[in-house]
Amino acid sequence: MPRRSARKAQSATASPADTNVVPAKDAPTTNSPPSTTSPNQAAADANQQQAGIVSSQSGPNAVGDSAPSTSVNNDGDIITRPTSDSIAAVANATKPAAVVSDPQSMKVTPIVNPSSYVCNVCNARFSTMSALSEHLRSDHRDDASTLLATPMINNAIRSFLTAWDGIRILSPDVSSKHLSAYLDSAVANGPELIVEDTGLCTSFMLLDNIPSAHLTKELIGFTWFMQMYQMTPPLPEGAVNRIVCMTNWASLGDEGRGLEVRLPPPTDSSVHAYKTVLSRGYIDNAQFNPLALRSNVLLMLLQFTLSNLKINKSSTFTSDVTTITSGRMIRAFEGRPELLALAYPGRAVLPTQTKNAQFLSTAIADRIGRLDRANLIGGEVSAMVECMELCDALTLHIRETYVMLLRSMHQDPTQIVQIVNECANNLLNSTIPISLRPTILCPWFASSEDLRLQQVMHLVNISSNTAAALPLVEALSTLLRSVTPLVLDPTVLTNAITTISESTTQTISPISEILRLLQPMGNDYAAFWKCIASWAYNGLVTTVLSEDAFPDSSQSITHLPSMWKCLFLTLAGPMTSDPHSPVKVFMALANLLAQPEPIAIGVPGMHQTTPASQFSHPGVWPPGFLNPQLINPQQAPLLRAFAEHIRANWPQPSEFGYGSTLQGSANLFIPPNRMVYPWPNQPLPRLTVAPTYDSAMSNWISTTIAFFIRVVNSVNMTATVNDLTRRTMTGVMTAMRQVKTMTPFYIQHMCPTELSVLASVTVTPPFQVPFTRLVQNDVITNVLVARVDPAQRGDAAVDIRATHATFAAALPVDPAAIVVAMLCGQTETNLIPSHHYGKAFAPLFASNAMFTRNQRAVITREAFVCARSAVAQCQDAGFLVPRPLDALRQFDVTSAAAAEIMHAVNDAFKTAFDLDGALLDGLALYGDPRIADLSAAYLQYGGNVVREHVPPGPSHIHRTLQQVESTFMAEMNLFNVARGNLYLVQTATNGNWSPMAPVAAPPFVRGGPNVRVVGRFGTIVPRPDGLEPQLIDDGNVPRDIAGDWVYPSDVLQVSVAVFCDYVWPMVKAGRTRVLVELGHYVYTLHYYDPQISLDEAPILEEWLSKINPAGIPPVPFCIPIPQVYPCITARRVHYAFTSENNNDSLFSTNAASIDTAFGENAAVSPLRWPGLVDPNYRVGTNDLPNRITLYNSLYRYNFTYPTLDGIMYVRSAT
């Protein structure tokens, strides 16, 4: 009801003169909105302001209610009645004492005829009542309640509509903007699958490590001639030429993967490549950890593999006009012409007889350039071209396997048409306007097992970061608002309830109060859409009624705002995905009826006055809610009826289909390509829409409001709430019940269609568990992830030692905003659903965004398998995988060490495929990352466990990584790693010295005669009387230092000080020989002029000084520079040499001369070039994993990668 003018402490004996003051003609009146039912009250407001009465002094108990009342008769005249002294006395007696600071407020506000008449709707002013009436009839004829609504109601309406004014930002008018933004974001979030390279397919550079020296004049002149004319030699011509690992050094085209393995030649240290993990913080810059060598080699090889995930792109072929290869088709390298000589070394003719010339003279001309295959087929460029050029076998193997991965993801365009039609619920017509070509590659497919694995990873990632689930709901909510024809129009509600008349003597206006409570909390206009979006992710996100929206549990049912809140909670409850929502709304009313209708709760520590929001576990559901028959209908009739109402009318879930069987299904706990839905649903009418009154939502709204009408008219209310207020409340509820809203129709027919289509294209597929509703034992209490194979651990999915529990991140929603959406949904009267959705859904299928989820699922599988393998290979016992690197040393990793390895693999994949967001992040953030397998399960309150085992499918990248690991063990010298052990033996010589390729038998071996093994601590035993100290051997027996000793590397690390002080001097003296058992180690080479004397001791002493228990530096070796002609050499003293041959990275020496007179003598090995020089070579074969060949046949591809709208035409089906 409208609040009348009020005064504080009005005198009961006011002077008559005070009530007869007439304002001057045309005196201005207040500009504030009128607050009374009579037009002349505007003048009264002005006089009230002059009297000094402020709004805080007015209210239901103020004297204003006992002031002379006014009314308007049929003729428009003012009737004035004097105030009764008795009424004034009662008012003063019931009013709390207050101190009035302004003496003017003690005056009686004069009530007189107004100088103008104000419209209650628009505040327009008129000089006569007839003019005002004409204005109302003409300008506000469509406002049904204009003449009935009071100014207070109009003010409440304006405030309500102002609060909801922001809803226009959710209007579908900006749908194209939202769709474009989402689709662009979805495409940007996709992995970078396509990286093409038109350069050379090689990761190893032939480098002149030591430049040529002491060349003859003829050779000097020839070298100058080539340099002068910028002629690139096909092969290096230095004194020492080595094969150096340097990925993508000859690439041309797209940018790389962001990961490169570029090792320096062995003359420089490369320890940085072997300290990626388990090294930071305690390993010096110049050291590596031999006990973590396997894990670091794994990570280095993974980066090597990922950096080469490219497609060998074909380029322009031209005819070669040189003499030897005349007529051969060779490629042109636009932008890097120097690659031409390197690509086809067999074309070169060297005029001087050198090692390179001898090798190139054996080249087979038919092994150069394109092989016999048509470049054009039917007028179209062929999908692939086979050619022979510089190409190392390992890089080729990686790239060919990656092409196989992309081909396994290829989606045939004819299938894409079917996929689009099924995903769009046949609301679109799609056709293929172009001819199908073999060059088309559409890597958009993922199997169901890949999608299911990705869903488990989503659960793992979100369980460690619940905030990550909320953007999924926001994104789908935005898409829903962009495609839906449903518009929320709050004026529907205001027009309905303002037809209800209110008495002007009511101290509380029910209409104003309900409009105040229905204002959106925190401007959350999208609560309704968030609820719908959360249904698709109810396994990750649970929408719950906001705690602020619950009535205060200390209030009673007679507190009308609390009763309204209870009504709104009940109406909005089924829209949430909270399985405890029914009991919460029941307890909200039970809180208000705690005194008149007590019921048993039956849970220790829980009472009927316990806040309803705390009933969020099936174990605390009241017995009366579970079985309404337990509530005595005489003692608690309303609660009994309320429980029965919830049991009878709470909507039951249903399901519908979505997606396409050709796209696979990511569902874990729901049948494939099905979505569960919390309301009953019906097919979409394709031609017409109309309000429905028999749907589940219509029934819920109608029966809920009918129940609360019963509450309003119950004995508990009639005793304290006056009849006028109850009549108004009943009228308001009846009006709300009769509102013609389209929301129930939308929920039953249109929303399932929207969710079905949008769920098919979102980046993150729906993650759902069944809606359990009112069955206590079926309520899901936990959704869990297990990291072991269920076949090994039957209870894995519910074992808290192996799992992390998370049943959805809570997303509070405002019930008031949901109620407004339920009552105020509108659509165009002439809406044709199929036509609308055809236009709305078409943009969704105009880009590749719908396939982003599939691409990410494949990368998730590849990353997971590689991460699991990397961790397992660093364990002594764990998941069974092939272990090619088992010979490398590695301590058994702990959970923390495994997490570091997992992080490194995860970061490598995210960098290589340019991925944002989480990939495998959650696996390393909690629990034990030493994974055997993944399974997901949910636990129900009744004890039932539903478990889904999700083993990953075969991984192409992992298979390639295993081949790379096997090749590393055979060709580790190319990565600056040596095998075998280190001898420290004094060797003085003037002759040749080749420490990396010993030719003689080893001086001694473990277990040989008189060979001792040092004890585990390398302890020294001093002796008296000038006797030499002794070493404790592995039998704990002191032995003389002189002789042959075996030092395990870990013993050397912990006793390096003893070694330097006692053992090393004996080695330099030639009295002791030491075998350091390293197994595998990083090394460096130091080349020197053999004509200058050299003592290797200072270099080794520097190396020994940097050894500590945490790590060792690269082992240094000294090698004389190979000489072209005989020379007089100086005497040199060497100590260090390897026990095995480690010279595989040596490509050639003195390649620009015919021979080497002194030093290492190596010519170009034909074994690395069978494709060029071996007549028995079979095209397409290689020597992996035993040897990396440098010249091979390969396919170069002419793929095209169309977008979805580039191969298909989409239009509305109507």
UniProtKB/Swiss-Prot annotation:
A zinc finger (C2H2-type) spans 117-140. Residues 8-18 have a biased composition (Polar residues). SMART domains: ZnF_C2H2 (SM00355). Pfam families: Lamba1_VP3, zf-C2H2_6. GO terms for biological process: 7-methylguanosine mRNA capping. PROSITE patterns: ZINC_FINGER_C2H2_1 (PS00028), ZINC_FINGER_C2H2_2 (PS50157). It is found in: Virion. Its main location: virion. Residues 1-80 are annotated as: Disordered. GO terms for molecular function: ATP binding; hydrolase activity; RNA helicase activity; zinc ion binding. Residues 28-51 have a biased composition (Low complexity). GO terms for cellular component: T=2 icosahedral viral capsid; viral inner capsid. The keyword Phosphoprotein does not apply. The keyword Nucleotide-binding applies. Keywords: ATP-binding, Capsid protein, Helicase, Hydrolase, Inner capsid protein, Metal-binding, mRNA capping, mRNA processing, Nucleotide-binding, T=2 icosahedral capsid protein, Virion, Zinc, Zinc-finger. Belongs to the turreted BTV-fold inner capsid family. Inner capsid protein that self-assembles to form an icosahedral capsid with a T=2 symmetry, which consists of 120 copies of VP2, with channels at each of its five-fold vertices. This capsid constitutes the innermost concentric layer of the viral mature particle. Homodecamer; each decamer is made up of two conformers of VP2, called VP2A and VP2B. 12 homodecamers assemble to form an icosahedral capsid. Interacts with VP6. This is Inner capsid protein VP3. It comes from Aquareovirus C (isolate Golden shiner/USA/GSRV/1977) (AQRV-C). The lineage of its organism: Viruses, Riboviria, Orthornavirae, Duplornaviricota, Resentoviricetes. The gene is S3.
